[in-house]
Amino acid sequence: MRKTKVDVVVIGAGQAGLAISYYLTRAKIEHVILERGSIANAWKNERWDSFCLVTPNWTINLPSALPSSVDPDAFMKKDDFVKLLENWAKSFRAPVMEGVCVSDLSRTGEDFKILTDSHIFLANQVIIATATYQRPKVPQMLRNLDPQWELKTAIDYKNPSSLREGAVLVVGSGQSGCQIAEELNNAGRSTYLSIGHTGRLPRRYRGADCIKWQLEMGWLDRRADFLDDPKKRFSGDPHLSGKNGGYTLSLHELRTSGVKLLGRIVSRDGPVLKLKGDVKTALQASDRYAIEFRRSVDEFIRNSGRTVPLPSRLELHGEPQGSAFDFEEIEQLDLLSENISTVIVATGFEFDFSWVKFPVLDETGYPKTNRGVTSVPGLYFMGLNWMYKRKSGIIYGVADDAEYIAEKVSTSKQRYYSTEADL
């Protein structure tokens, strides 16, 4: 197997990998980016056709990436965002090697050894920018579903016409699950949605987008030690949509429009799913999240002395109406009798860093870092959930972390060559 020695290897060519490449290029540090697919691979191949970003375009603050012609308050479609990342990579000649899958990261002598499907790379420093979401979670009781039902995950789903005829069960009520269920229902498919206790964010409130308020209130700059439980790094994001200019995505509205809401799946006996019967408490949890968010904004406005408009009727869209809780809980669902042909699982993702053969992972297998810097000199991570701040794992935050890590790489490089010169 061919061997190549490079100064720095970056693993992953999404927004995090490209951001670190931008700053390494600016510092004239030799590096290569290894990408298992192509640039922006997850955005390109693991999102449904109509996918839009749920954060406004102004959050795409990658240096020199966003064209001035783009409306900062609009929401970019998937294909447009992919094209933006591709064009950005071309603009600074990002050294991306596509179709190179890394399977092992270890040490050989003084070098990092990166094993791929066709190549061995040796490097002085390595930056892992594969983010947190490597593979979809699938509940145990659904993993061995009979082939007569098509089992898909959110990354497999493309559009309603790509599915078998019949009703569809969507499992999971985070951003993906709710948006997919809405699209299926709007396409005339009989749609069931198994919901959890995920929050709802009002798309806009008191004249500004909810993400703008989060920025203004300092929520995006909250540090990881703000969390009282490290597991909250992986909590499901509240549901909302950037489609058609962006709007509040409400479980109440989905139910009113015809989506059949179900509680959590407890177990399965053949085609019959036993349900927890907790739809009402899940709806209340979603409502509570929205109420608490608005209360936080109101308090922030009062304390800052700002003059902003009162909430409009449209901004309060999605709130429960008079008969919102007037229904009977469903305790079980028979996939056969309900003519369900497809089950789409949208219950989040799992990380897998088992290929990293260094003592830099905690008891759950998640990287332990200080703003991306590990205890192993020369080994770094990028784009992780709450890696340094809340924004570290989203588009808005990767540039700040990339600039910081690039400086660490540069400092380490200078120290490395100074040591060599002294020998």
Outline where the language-model segments fall:
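Flavin (primarily FAD) cofactor-binding/catalytic cores of flavoenzymes
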Residues: 2-13, 19-42, 76-423
